[in-house]
Design a protein with these regions (language model features):
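Post-HEXXH active-site segment of zinc metalloproteases
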Residues: 72-82
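Generic hydrophobic alpha-helical membrane-span motif
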Residues: 67-68, 132
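Histidine/acidic-rich helix-loop-helix segments that form or flank divalent-metal centers
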Residues: 89-145
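Alpha-helical architecture
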Residues: 20-23, 59-60, 124-127
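His-Asp-centered metal-binding catalytic motifs of divalent-metal-dependent phosphohydrolases/nucleases
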Residues: 47-67, 75, 97-106
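Alpha-helical phosphate/pyrophosphate-handling elements in metalloenzyme active cores
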Residues: 17-54, 66-67, 82-86
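Short alpha-helical hairpin
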Residues: 1-11
Length: 145
């Protein structure tokens, strides 16, 4: 499955992002999440539907973040139109949307959401991305805003 349209959508929506929640963060999350999935599932193929779901969630997860998006509902509606055009089924669209709407730390403070397997990989990759040198750089950038 080709997710180039998802990548371009993310580039468009995060092009002016300066807090560390930019396209390159989404790309790192997408790549790390899919790498972890493939390491856990050695029989899976890099071009599998599950990898496409995981990568799409990784790319899209900050496009609806209120820190960087003025109108998350509008972007969610755009994503709902985009994903079927790419070839995702209704269930796959639901998995991706549920993940990006419920994976953040703040979304889980009062209620812990159980993400689909694909979302668990995206959430883990996003949290790992917040650690180390990149996480420190992003914290200084966002904290200075």
């Amino acid at each position: 499955m080709n997710i180039d349209a998802v990548v371009e959508f993310t580039k468009k929506h995060l092009k002016d992002e300066k807090t560390g929640h930019d396209f390159y963060h989404g790309q790192r999350v997408a790549n790390l999440a899919s790498k972890m999935y493939l390491e856990d599932h050695p029989d899976a193929h890099a071009d599998s539907r599950m990898v496409a779901i995981i990568k799409s969630g990784g790319y899209l997860h900050d496009t609806i973040d209120e820190k960087v998006c003025d109108n998350p509902d509008k972007v969610i509606a755009e994503i709902k139109e985009l994903l079927p055009e790419v070839g995702f089924t209704d269930l796959e669209v639901w998995d991706i949307l549920f993940t990006i709407q419920h994976m953040s730390f703040s979304a889980n403070i009062e209620h812990h959401y159980h993400l689909p397997l694909s979302g668990q990989y995206v959430q883990d990759a996003d949290r790992l991305e917040s650690l180390g040198a990149m996480g420190i750089a992003r914290a200084f950038t966002y904290g200075g805003k």
